[in-house]
């Protein structure tokens, strides 16, 4: 039996909104220590990995491991039926063919119950090895989102170049070109605005703008985004939750793709 209760439905809504435009069919694996999910987009360029730890829930019980295959488009429709401030409980038995979503507004004594049919999704769960990265940076997710949105107006590709002292984003398209340069700094009074950079090797990589536009939708989950880059591995973009994370592994574009 699974019973996973969020104190506010808005958290689960934001989690799903953070990656529902990247992938459609997802297996959620529910275990004693929380819920994990993983999916690859149709082009096999982007891998999404989600972990929601027990501490993220107001109440959590999972007596037996269970996999819930869901269509995120359908799930999102049901999530829109609940208010952000409602509590949300996910309920499923040990061999479910559907999942119950229970929204409760304790102030109004209102209870809304919805059932979503589950799917048998044929997808392997990949073991993600710990990778070595050439450069690691952390910056406000709002700033990264603005950079991506602005530069995507000019080109369908965005280049990220990192040196010891600067982080440069470049777009070069048919209508023109643009660049944004930011530098690492630490604000002791407002640490959430700091930009941190650890560089072992310079990085010069290009990514599809449409994928970056999908990735920045995870910004509603966290004030900051962590980015790890390497010429030998997919880039990692990570938004941390109170307990867990939402990760995007994105393969760079090569010269013959640009």
From Swiss-Prot:
Which key words are in the record?
A: DNA damage, DNA repair, DNA replication, DNA-binding, Isopeptide bond, Nucleus, Ubl conjugation
**The keyword Signal belongs to this UniProt entry's keyword annotation:** no
Q: What is its main location?
A: nucleus
Where's the DNA-binding part? Answer: 61-80
What GO annotations for molecular function exist for this entry? DNA binding; DNA polymerase processivity factor activity; identical protein binding
Q: Extract the InterPro entries matched here.
A: DNA_clamp_sf, Pr_cel_nuc_antig, Pr_cel_nuc_antig_C, Pr_cel_nuc_antig_CS, Pr_cel_nuc_antig_N
Looking up SUPFAM superfamilies in the UniProt record yields:
DNA clamp (SSF55979)
Cross-link Glycyl lysine isopeptide (Lys-Gly) (interchain with G-Cter in SUMO) position reads 127, 164
What is known about its subunit structure?
Homotrimer. Interacts with RAD30. Interacts with MCM10. Interacts with UBP10.
Primary role: This protein is an auxiliary protein of DNA polymerase delta and is involved in the control of eukaryotic DNA replication by increasing the polymerase's processibility during elongation of the leading strand. Involved in DNA repair.
User: Any idea what this protein is called?
Assistant: Proliferating cell nuclear antigen
Which source organism does the UniProt entry give?
A: Saccharomyces cerevisiae (strain ATCC 204508 / S288c) (Baker's yeast)
Q: Which gene encodes it?
A: POL30
């Amino acid at each position: 039996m699974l019973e996973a209760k969020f104190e506010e439905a808005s958290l689960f809504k934001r989690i799903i909104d953070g990656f529902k435009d990247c992938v459609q069919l997802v297996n959620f694996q529910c275990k004693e220590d929380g819920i994990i999910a993983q999916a690859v987009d149709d082009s096999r360029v982007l891998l999404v990995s989600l972990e929601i730890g027990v501490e993220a829930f107001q109440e959590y019980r999972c007596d037996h491991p269970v996999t819930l295959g869901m269509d995120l488009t359908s799930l999102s429709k049901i999530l829109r039926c609940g208010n952000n401030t409602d509590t949300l409980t996910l309920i499923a038995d040990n061999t479910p063919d559907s999942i119950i979503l229970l929204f409760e507004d304790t102030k109004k004594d209102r209870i809304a119950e919805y059932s979503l049919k589950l799917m048998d999704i044929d997808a392997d769960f990949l073991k993600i090895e710990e990778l070595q990265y050439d450069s690691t940076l952390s910056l406000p997710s709002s700033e990264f989102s603005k950079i991506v949105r602005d530069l995507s107006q000019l080109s369908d590709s965005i280049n990220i170049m990192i040196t010891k002292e600067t982080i440069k984003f470049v777009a070069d398209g048919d209508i023109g070109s643009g660049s944004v340069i930011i530098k690492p700094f630490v604000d002791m009074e407002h640490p959430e605005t700091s930009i941190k950079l650890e560089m072992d090797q310079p990085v010069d990589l290009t990514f599809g703008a449409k994928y970056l536009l999908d990735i920045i939708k995870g910004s509603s989950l966290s004030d900051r985004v962590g980015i790890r880059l390497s010429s030998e591995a997919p880039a990692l973009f990570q938004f941390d939750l109170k307990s867990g994370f939402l990760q995007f592994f994105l393969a760079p574009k090569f010269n013959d793709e640009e």
